[in-house]
From Swiss-Prot:
Recorded superkingdom: Bacteria
Role summary: Large subunit of the glutamine-dependent carbamoyl phosphate synthetase (CPSase). CPSase catalyzes the formation of carbamoyl phosphate from the ammonia moiety of glutamine, carbonate, and phosphate donated by ATP, constituting the first step of 2 biosynthetic pathways, one leading to arginine and/or urea and the other to pyrimidine nucleotides.
UniProt cofactor note: Binds 4 Mg(2+) or Mn(2+) ions per subunit.
Organism in which the protein naturally occurs: Mycolicibacterium vanbaalenii (strain DSM 7251 / JCM 13017 / BCRC 16820 / KCTC 9966 / NRRL B-24157 / PYR-1)
Binding of Mg(2+) 2, residues: 304, 306
Cofactor: Mg(2+); Mn(2+)
Positions with a binding annotation for ATP 2: 729, 768, 770, 775, 800-803, 843, 855
Alphabetical GO biological process terms: 'de novo' UMP biosynthetic process; glutamine metabolic process; L-arginine biosynthetic process
Domain ATP-grasp stretches: 138-333, 693-884
Region (Carboxyphosphate synthetic domain): 1-407
Subunit annotation: Composed of two chains; the small (or glutamine) chain promotes the hydrolysis of glutamine to ammonia, which is used by the large (or ammonia) chain to synthesize carbamoyl phosphate. Tetramer of heterodimers (alpha,beta)4.
Binding-site residues for ATP 1, renumbered to this chain: 134, 174, 180-181, 213, 215, 220, 246-248, 290, 304
Protein's name in the database: Carbamoyl phosphate synthase large chain
Length: 1112
């Protein structure tokens, strides 16, 4: 049937900030949905708090609200549209992850949808409840003849204890209505049960947890299914987890299609999946169902389902070429599967199930190095921050490609230090899942362990272990062969080995380039295959490619000739990680769309299945490949060959994808690849402290005093000369990796030992640390003759907090005109001094009216999307055009940039935008189960960001906090404990809170200072102080854990008892999910936000309205 005529206006809820467990896959899903709905003639309103997303670009919806995703704010949007006579007919919440689903449930429960006559489409309220509520779902599984793990839903700790007594330990604890396994875990002891179930009851919006028998070690599978209003069902993809049950599927290596299922098991799963889908009532959309199989007896149970588009849906979409989110959106508005045409073949309908003639492997990317002390054990709580995907003609080829796609410094096995230990020690280690288990499996086999021993120890299916065993045998062949001949080299490449891996085993070839030269001499090159959804049964019309090394030398590539248009290759940013997230993907997508419009053929290279850049119709051609020198160069050659007789590849863009492509620029240029925009030598100049310092000296721009050290003695002399505190860091890092503020010589010695291990080929930088300075961030464009300031941002936290973790405001709220003019002059001098062509980000610190240059990055920064949303200027699009020859003057004429002026000086009526970082501290614990410290510093720790935008700073800040962490309290109790240096600065913010009616708790020293300043407060004991006569009975931590505190203000002390006390206070605040402010500036901003909330005048406005006002 055609689309429903009664639907004219649809509200789409996005997923908000990038979190562990809910990442960029929902930007990909939501972007697809918005495009489809608008193409169908529907009016679309979107709400999403994440400015780094493509979906929040104003062109993807009629009304785009960058607002917190809460029931309160969504209702404000619905009400505003209704007041304007523009009633919203339907709410589509199945494409925004768990956040959107939970918000939709609240809007149903509080009556808002009924009040405004808004229908839930995709999955209705009852379907969401049946799919998400553990007990209801278990009942459905039983009804359709399936089996669940023995379990019980518990609402109290007493019920939890009774259930554990019945089931026996170990048990799995799973909260309802959470994502990424938040709050879940394997409990081996009564103490584990108390902690995990307590956390789970707190994490679950419905305050219940499922206590389940342990199925640890079973094999895990997933099915992606879709159903339409006529009860047509398709199984889009089967996915098998390499890791057994007990490891969250988001942290497991996964493989599609499933490799080790028997046909009978698959058919049983398929039948059960379809019956469950029908019974739950997801009648217009997609869902994901997880199963477990006992490898000993074949017992099959159903674990859970997601009645929405999920992380696995994005993976399945990229793995098969079947656009699940796009089709789900069409099904939600009334179409049936047989009416929807497959985009890739342009002739088969969507009711044709995809067929794969290749293997897909996804691997997680972890960031444990960012959280010292965090337990690296993989459990049912997801901990990975990103993922990479690869395609190959066999499992082992795809595995090799995905391992080098993760960008951990290795190119697969044998390209880093071997794991430690004897065969018995490695087998013992394999009983516990960690992020290094692939390397442990290979090493155990290499040391002589049998496939069966490794499979038993790790719980990994013997078939997968056997495949890695084939690589161990191949390694021995490569080492032992007297000469590396064509047959062995071709077989090595067919099995996924990179040139770097082969070079590591054949020293006589003198490195990766030696292997490359040998390959070229022997005529061994990859062929490029096509993802077509139908195993070549029908012709693919969409060029979506992956590489493979065939054993047959006559195998042909499938890259179609295209000689008419000049080609531009865009290097993406690879897997998301802390320091390099979707902000960079945003810039790559903008480059692809704007350059296609400008007449170029755009070619995207990336390996991240979550992103919009790897959608098959973002660029003219897509290569799903690792971002390594070897892989990129082969694509360049393939594209040059396909463009023979025409202009060919005129440029490769490395400036937009973060540090990953920048790291390849120099080698690619030396290999003859044309790099456009800022040249590699200019990129190196900006990174080299000595050369960059010379640029600043010539321009008369001050920078903090610094020195370079390769030993502790050198570092000690430099630190003594410039004075403590100092900021120490290795060079060439993104996200502040390895950075630390050091206050004394003892700490410096420990740091130098660690840092030189981190980056032995580069010296350690020792900078004077500017305490209490205001940090400023600038994004600018330069075409070689003119500089255009995109935006000037003022950081809310002082210098010393990584810019990616600091909240910032645009326009700046305390800088004067003379400060901004100084920023402009400095930015122009730096842009011309380096030789920037494209984007430039500069960070400054303003202290005692002196503007210091901290660093300059001649590339797209993570703030580009935020600045673009706040100012209505598409910086990434302008950058792409400038790199390919356009001038700023030309872009002004075309209306891409403002005809006069730029973003340095904003209009008086310009709204204030606040960007806030989202931090994942609640995801990580130490091995003993205690929280890790939530203190911020120069090393970046945030996974994502939100934006609040309003007429004044207080309202914008309040929105940003609500979007990131939940509403600031309007009343209640605030606990204050601050370092001596901060006490004077905090008098006014705390007095204002007291005046607003807040009860103030404080520790002894802080309480004394507050009372002297006329602020009433109650005293609590420090956590490390034993209770004795004369001390308050309740400690600060006790008060927080008892639920008596609504906000914490705690700035760090030195390294003694109070420092430990501060850690305990902050950890307690994180565990209780209450706001915890760790800087003076943050406290002042929070007070302004609280005042705005109490005033009650925080409204909503769409970006379209805001941008229209900016242009008028």
């Amino acid at each position: 049937m055609p689309r429903r005529p009664d639907l004219n206006h649809v509200l789409v809820i996005g997923s908000g900030p990038i979190l562990i467990g809910q990442a960029a896959e929902f930007d990909y899903s939501g972007t697809q949905a918005c495009r489809v709905l608008r193409a169908e003639g529907l009016q679309v309103t979107l709400i999403n708090s994440n400015p780094a997303t493509i979906m929040t670009d104003p062109e993807y919806a009629d009304h785009t609200y960058v607002e917190p995703i809460t029931a309160e704010f969504v209702e404000k949007v619905i009400a505003q549209q209704a007041e304007r006579g523009n009633k919203i007919d339907a709410l589509l919440a199945t494409l925004g992850g768990q956040t959107a689903l939970n918000t939709a449930v609240k809007l149903s429960e509080n009556g808002a949808l009924e009040r405004y006559g808004v229908e839930l489409i995709g999955a209705d309220f009852e379907a969401i409840q049946r799919g998400e509520d553990r007990q209801k779902f278990k009942d459905i599984v039983t009804k359709v003849g399936g089996e669940s793990a023995r379990s019980r839903v518990c609402f109290t700790m007493d019920e939890v204890r009774d259930t554990v007594a019945d089931l026996g330990l170990p048990v799995v604890v799973r909260p309802s209505f959470t994502m990424g396994g938040l709050g879940s875990g394997m409990a081996y002891s009564a103490e584990d049960v108390e902690r995990m179930a307590g956390d789970g009851l707190a994490a679950s919006p419905s305050a219940n947890v499922l206590i389940e028998e342990s199925i640890y070690g079973w094999k895990e599978y997933e099915l992606e299914l879709m159903r339409d209003g006529h009860d047509n069902v398709v199984v889009v993809c089967s996915i098998e987890n390499f890791d057994p049950m007990g490891v969250h599927t988001g942290d497991s290596v996964t493989v599609a299609p499933a490799m080790t299922l028997t046909d009978r098991e698959y058919q049983t799963m398929r039948t059960l999946g379809i019956e469950i889908l029908r019974e739950v009532g997801v009648d217009t959309g997609g869902c994901n169902i997880q199963f477990a199989v006992n490898p000993k007896d074949g017992r099959l149970i159903v674990i859970e389902m997601n009645p929405r588009v999920s992380r696995s849906s994005a993976l399945a979409s990229k793995a098969t070429g079947f656009p699940i989110a796009k089709i789900a959106a069409k099904l939600a508005i009334g179409y049936t599967l047989d009416e929807i045409v497959n985009d890739i073949t342009k002739e088969t309908p969507a009711c044709f199930e995809p067929t794969l003639d290749y293997v897909v492997v996804k691997a997680p990317r972890f960031a444990f190095e960012k959280f010292p002390g965090a337990d690296g054990t993989l459990t049912t709580t997801m901990k990975s921050v990103g993922e990479a995907m690869s395609l190959g003609r066999n499992f082992i080829e795809a595995l090799g490609k995905v391992m080098r796609s993760l960008e951990t410094g290795r190119a697969g096995f044998w390209t880093g230090p071997d794991p430690e230990g004897s065969v018995d020690e490695v087998l013992t280690r394999l009983h516990t899942a960690t992020d290094g288990r692939l390397y442990d499996i290979e090493y155990a086999l290499r040391l002589g362990a049998t496939v069966e021993q490794v499979a038993v120890a790790s719980g990994v299916d013997p078939w997968f272990v056997e495949q890695i065993g084939r690589l161990v045998a191949l390694r021995a062949e490569l080492i032992d062969a007297p000469v590396l001949g064509e047959e062995l080299l071709r077989r090595s490449k067919h099995n996924g080995l990179s040139d770097r891996q082969i070079a590591a085993l054949r020293p006589e070839l003198a490195g990766e380039m030696g292997v490359r030269v040998l390959r070229q001499r022997l005529g061994i090159h990859p062929v490029f295959k096509t993802v077509d959804t139908c195993a070549a049964e029908f012709e693919a019309r969409t060029p979506y490619h992956y590489s493979s090394y065939e054993l047959d030398p006559s195998a042909e590539t499938e890259v179609a000739p295209q000689a008419e248009r000049p080609k531009v290759l865009i290097l993406g940013s690879g897997p998301n990680r802390i320091g390099q997230g979707i902000e960079f993907d945003y810039s790559c997508v903008h480059a692809a769309t704007t350059l296609t419009e400008a007449g170029f053929e755009t070619v995207m290279i990336n390996c991240n299945p979550e992103t919009v850049s790897t959608d098959y119709d973002t660029a003219d051609r897509l290569y799903f490949e690792p971002l390594t020198f070897e892989d990129v160069l082969e694509i360049y050659y393939a594209e040059q060959a396909s463009g023979e007789g025409g202009p060919g590849v005129v440029g490769v863009i490395v400036q937009l994808g973060g540090q990953t492509p920048l790291g390849l620029a120099e080698r690619l240029e030396k290999a003859g690849v044309p790099i456009v925009g800022t040249l590699p030598e200019a990129i190196d100049l900006a990174e080299d402290r000595g050369e960059f310092g010379e640029v600043l000296r010539r321009a008369g721009l001050p920078a903090p005093r610094f020195g370079m050290a390769t030993s502790f003695d050198q570092a000690r002399r430099i630190a003594a000369e410039i004075g403590y505190p100092v900021l120490v860091r290795p060079s060439y890092v993104l996200g502040g990796r390895g950075m630390e503020i050091v206050y004394d010589e003892e700490t410096l010695e420990g740091y130098i030992t660690r840092a030189t291990e981190l980056s032995p080929e580069h010296p350690v930088l020792v900078d004077r640390f500017l305490e209490d300075a205001i940090e400023i961030d600038v994004d600018a464009l330069c075409d070689g003759t003119e500089v255009y300031i995109g935006g000037v941002m003022e950081h809310i936290e002082e210098a010393g907090i990584h810019s990616g973790d600091s909240a910032c405001a645009l326009p700046p709220v305390t800088l004067g005109r003379s400060d901004i003019e100084a920023v402009r002059r400095a930015t122009e001098a730096i842009a011309f001094g380096i030789g920037v062509v494209g984007l430039l980000n500069v960070q400054y610190a303003l202290k005692d009216d002196v503007l210091y240059v901290l660093e300059a990055n001649p590339r797209a920064s993570r703030t580009v999307p935020f600045v673009s949303k706040a100012t209505a200027v598409p910086l990434a699009k302008a950058c792409a055009r400038i790199m390919l020859g356009a001038t700023i003057a030309q872009l002004r004429e075309e209306g891409v940039l403002a005809s006069t002026g730029d973003g340095a000086v904003t209009a008086r009526n310009a709204p204030v935008a606040v960007k806030e970082a989202v931090l994942p501290f609640h995801r990580f614990r130490k091995a003993d189960g205690s929280q890790i410290d939530s203190l911020l510093g120069p090393e970046m720790k945030s996974t994502g960001e939100v934006m609040g935008i309003a007429a004044d700073f207080g309202s914008a800040f309040a929105k940003s906090q609500t979007a990131a962490y939940g509403s600031l309290p309007a009343q209640g109790t605030v606990f204050v404990s601050v370092a001596n240096r901060d006490k004077r600065s905090l008098v006014f913010p705390v007095k204002r809170l007291a005046d607003l009616g807040f009860r103030v708790l404080a520790t002894e020293g802080t309480a004394e200072m507050l009372r002297r300043n006329g602020i009433p407060c109650e005293e609590v004991r420090k956590h490390f102080q034993e209770f004795s006569e004369g001390l308050p009975q309740m400690s600060a931590v006790d008060a927080i854990k008892a639920g008596h505190v609504d906000m914490v203000i705690n700035t760090p002390y030195g390294n003694s008892g109070p420092r430990i006390d501060g850690y305990e206070i902050r950890s307690a605040a994180v565990s209780m999910n209450i706001p915890c402010v760790t800087t003076v500036q943050g406290a002042s901003a929070a007070v302004q936000g609280i005042e705005a909330g109490i005033r009650g005048d925080i409204g909503v406005r769409s970006l379209q309205e805001l941008h229209s006002a900016l242009g008028s």
